[in-house]
Amino acid sequence: FLNLLSAVDVYFIRDDRKTAYLYYKNCAVKVTAKGIDIIDYIDLGGYVWKDQVIDRDFKKCRADKCDYKQFISNISGGAEDRIKSVESTIGFLLHSYKNLGYCPAVILNDEVISENPEGGTGKGLFVNAISHLKHTVTIDGKSFSFERSFPYQLVSADTQLLTFDDVKKHFEFERLFSIVTEGITLEKKNKDAIMIPFERSPKIVITTNYAIKGKGGSFERRKWELEFTQYYNQEQTPLKEFGRLLFGDWDEDEWCRFDNYMVNNLKGYLNTGMVSSTHKNLRKRKFIAE
């Protein structure tokens, strides 16, 4: 009976070097360096993964008074070059296309150097924002071990972002080299291993309170680092500043501003690529770590 069934080729829409797509309940949003277009699904010309569809509608609106835009300015110290760098990084993470020449892991760190770093600078909220647009799997960095059986069992073929959250001191970034540049092998209990090739594998984010050790071209080609200022702490929180929880307490209008801000960051990235900025303490932090 199975021999009588014909195979059907299913074409999934994928980002390419110049084009990115975001999928909402009511439409697909096509983003290029030149503009942002809303496309009806009937005109899309292919399939999308169910888990990659964002559970809200999209419409165009102004984004200049967006909570999250102000949050990005705050964690960037209000410096224009740092804001542009963070916004271009957002665009990079929203663009599912992976360039074989350069597709680094994004490493988020604190600007302030401390013997007992407390975090709370906004790294988690930064990743949380991306997760509201991209199918994200988060791994607890404190308990993660490369030696553990099936370390990536939560990852699937439609995962777009893999985050190692709050990794420990002396995290072995070198152990991720093959994932960053070659793809990821998924192993699950009692199932055959599946190799997700580089171009379809998730982009990588690492959040940490410590310097990621490593020297040489191999390390530099595989990482893109951002420092967040100590604008937020246990006393000064986003909740206290905005009077509502980011994401959790937003109404429809604020979600509209957020979506348009993020889509514009994606458009900006497709224009400029990743924008670098000066790091205040990153080199010093690495020297201490050595």
Residue map of PLM features:
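Intein modules and their embedded homing endonuclease domains
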Residues: F1-V48
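Short, conserved secondary-structure transition motifs
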Residues: L2-R14, I196-N209
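P-loop NTPase catalytic core of nucleic-acid-dependent motor ATPases
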Residues: A28-D158, W224-L226, M262, K267, ...
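Switch/connector loops and helix/strand junctions flanking conserved nucleotide-binding motifs
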Residues: G122-K123, H170-E174, I212-S218, Y232-T237
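Conserved catalytic/switch belt of AAA+ P-loop NTPases
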Residues: H135, E172-I196
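AAA+/SF3 P-loop NTPase mechanochemical coupling elements
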Residues: F150-A157, K188-T207
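Walker B catalytic acidic pair
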Residues: F164-V167
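Phosphate-sensing "switch" segment of ASCE/P-loop ATPases
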Residues: F198-S201, G216-A289
